[in-house]
């Protein structure tokens, strides 16, 4: 039987130990996984909100060009 490359290759071994064979307790519930997904969504929304806020102009004469710039270039 050939050794598993996932457990013998140095780089794949590091990825395997941290992501695939996760060193986590076996009694983690589905709520823990759901909460981590919610945290990822929250961080994504905060980062995209900050990105859009940096490209927004509140001046009435520049408002349309600001939205057009956001739709075109961001």
UniProtKB/Swiss-Prot annotation:
Heme 1 (or BL or b562) is low-potential and absorbs at about 562 nm, and heme 2 (or BH or b566) is high-potential and absorbs at about 566 nm. The cytochrome bc1 complex contains 11 subunits: 3 respiratory subunits (MT-CYB, CYC1 and UQCRFS1), 2 core proteins (UQCRC1 and UQCRC2) and 6 low-molecular weight proteins (UQCRH/QCR6, UQCRB/QCR7, UQCRQ/QCR8, UQCR10/QCR9, UQCR11/QCR10 and a cleavage product of UQCRFS1). This cytochrome bc1 complex then forms a dimer. It is a multi-pass membrane protein. Its cofactor is heme. One of its GO terms (molecular function) is ubiquinol-cytochrome-c reductase activity. Keywords: Electron transport, Heme, Iron, Membrane, Metal-binding, Mitochondrion, Mitochondrion inner membrane, Respiratory chain, Transmembrane, Transmembrane helix, Transport, Ubiquinone. It is found in: Mitochondrion inner membrane. Binds 2 heme groups non-covalently. One of its GO terms (biological process) is mitochondrial electron transport, ubiquinol to cytochrome c. The keyword Iron applies. This is Cytochrome b. Belongs to the cytochrome b family. Signal peptide: none annotated. The lineage of its organism: Eukaryota, Metazoa, Chordata, Craniata, Vertebrata. The chain crosses the membrane at residues 34-54. Disulfide bonds: none annotated. PANTHER family: CYTOCHROME B (PTHR19271:SF16). One of its GO terms (cellular component) is mitochondrial inner membrane. Component of the ubiquinol-cytochrome c reductase complex (complex III or cytochrome b-c1 complex) that is part of the mitochondrial respiratory chain. The b-c1 complex mediates electron transfer from ubiquinol to cytochrome c. Contributes to the generation of a proton gradient across the mitochondrial membrane that is then used for ATP synthesis. The keyword S-adenosyl-L-methionine does not apply. InterPro entries: Cyt_b/b6_N, Cytb/b6-like_sf, Di-haem_cyt_TM.
């Amino acid at each position: 039987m050939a050794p598993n490359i996932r457990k013998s290759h140095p780089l794949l071994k590091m990825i395997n130990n941290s992501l695939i064979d996760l060193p986590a307790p076996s009694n983690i519930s589905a709520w823990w996984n759901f909460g981590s997904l919610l945290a990822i969504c929250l961080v994504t929304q905060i980062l995209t909100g900050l990105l859009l806020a940096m490209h927004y102009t509140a001046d009435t004469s520049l408002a349309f060009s600001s939205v057009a710039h956001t739709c075109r270039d961001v």
